Swiss-Prot record:
Residues 14-21 are annotated as: G1. Residues 5-228 form the tr-type G domain. This is Elongation factor 1-alpha. Transmembrane segments: none annotated. GO terms for molecular function: GTP binding; GTPase activity; translation elongation factor activity. This protein promotes the GTP-dependent binding of aminoacyl-tRNA to the A-site of ribosomes during protein biosynthesis. Residues 70-74 are annotated as: G2.
């Protein structure tokens, strides 16, 4: 048996018309899980609708439409492979909940592909103050996406000019550096997602470019380390009652290892029970590791005791607990007015969805250095501001420090049906043990 290829999760970011769908569609089309029949169907429909030239974006638009209509489509369609890795596109902007998904996303992106359009005016619109390019770069950095590849797209529209490519590279590099990335470690690839230049094969139209193709750049990313050595953390997505088996919580292992026989403690309530068995895709597992989506059977607990948003951990190894309050670095991205103390939006953190109060605005933060700015407590914060905030949940909640457990330490601040801010947890005040252990069961 050949060793299975390493899985890598990608998020595709960039301004609205930069050509993300076309580029992504092209990769899936050429290296991915779409069979010939589906492609022919798409080509035919595309021609019938007068789209004339078959656009790769068509692939993605169809998948997206099916996804949004709630048709569960084969997730393999969002996968493609290279000689080294299996890639899964975990999200692409254009989905209504893109930003929320990126934060609470069941999986952390290992690498971001930033697509920028080279066209005159197009690039400038994307990188302008209200363009999405900056927002997405900032988001990726805040959420701990360490690796990035930049695709300078639509090179065909500017006659493959090197000067324009260099100009864009210079400007994006400056912004990446300001955000905290090291641009020297980021490959910039001039591409045409539509014509196929430098996507998979080196382009004959750009003899001046000596770097890797987009696929080549993807092949040279560093595989992520999966955090098996950390204590167990498994946020629950659902809890099922299955006749003949009992109570089955379901979720994704974020850190650590779950084995049958483990005494599992659930936060924030503190109830605990032995894990009897674990299943993934209807197959029994001897252990579940980070990245595994599993169901596991617990004794003596009902669906009233545990619910979505709870966090399962090992009772004997630094178990998760509920929090009284926590301090977080919050970046305001999309709020129409001023946020003052007392503001109580909904926070989406891992699988939980709970109203939380901004108890105190502690200080503004200089985004370049990450340090608190002079001037003490701000009266309010607004779009573009980064601040240290003390947050109090209105109901029991379990969060962790981002530095220790990243997936449990990132959150989206939701208000008016949109993501108004993002944050990472810096410090947590745990709830007193006796307050939560009253309902303990074995």
């Amino acid at each position: 048996m050949p060793k299975e290829k390493t899985h890598i999760n990608i998020v595709v970011i960039g301004h609205v018309d930069s050509g993300k769908s076309t580029t992504t569609g092209h990769l899936i089309y050429k290296c991915g899980g779409i069979d010939q029949r589906t492609i022919e169907k798409f080509e035919k429909e595309s021609a019938e609708m007068g789209k004339g030239s078959f656009k790769y974006a068509w692939v993605l638009d169809n998948l997206k439409a099916e996804r949004e209509r709630g048709i569960t489509i084969d997730i393999s369609l969002w996968k493609f492979e290279t000689s080294k890795y299996y890639f899964t596109i975990i999200d692409a902007p254009g989905h209504r909940d893109f930003i929320k998904n990126m934060i609470t996303g069941t999986s952390q992106a290992d690498v971001a592909i930033l697509i920028v359009a080279a066209g005159t005016g197009e690039f400038e619109a994307g990188i302008s103050k209200n363009g999405q390019t900056r927002e997405h770069i900032l988001l990726s950095y805040t959420l701990g996406v360490k690796q990035m590849i930049v695709g300078v797209n639509k090179m065909d529209a500017i006659q493959y000019k090197q000067e324009r490519y260099e100009e864009i590279k210079k400007e994006i590099s400056a912004f990446l550096k300001k955000t905290g990335y090291n641009p020297d470690k980021i490959p910039f690839v001039p591409i045409s997602g539509f014509q196929g230049d430098n996507m998979i094969e080196p382009s004959t139209n750009m003899p001046w470019y000596k770097g890797p193709t987009l696929i080549g750049a993807l092949d040279s990313v560093t595989p992520p380390e999966r955090p098996v050595d950390k204590p167990l953390r498994l946020p629950l997505q659902d809890v099922y009652k299955i006749s003949g088996i009992g109570t089955v919580p379901v979720g994704r292992v974020e850190t650590g290892i779950l084995k049958p026989g483990t005494i599992v403690q659930f936060a924030p309530s503190g109830v605990s029970s032995e894990c009897k068995s674990i299943e993934m895709h209807h197959t029994a597992l001897a252990q579940a590791i980070p990245g595994d989506n599993v169901g596991f059977n617990v004794r003596n607990l009902t669906v009233k005791d545990i619910k979505r948003g709870n966090v399962a951990s090992d009772a004997k190894n630094q178990p998760a607990v509920g929090c009284e309050d926590f301090t977080a670095q919050v970046i305001v991205m999309n709020h129409p007015g001023q946020i003052r103390k007392g503001y109580t939006p909904v926070l989406d953190c891992h699988t939980s969805h709970i109203a939380c109060k901004f108890e105190e605005l502690l200080s503004k933060i200089d985004r370049r250095t990450g340090k608190s700015m002079e001037g003490g407590e701000p009266e309010y914060i607004k779009n573009g501001d980064s601040a240290l905030v003390k947050i109090v949940p209105t109901k029991p909640l379990c969060v962790e420090e981002f530095a220790k457990f990243p997936p449990l330490g990132r959150f989206a601040v939701r208000d008016m049906k949109q993501t108004v801010a993002v944050g990472v947890v810096k410090a947590v005040t745990p709830r007193a043990a006796n307050a939560s252990a009253a309902g303990k069961k074995k």
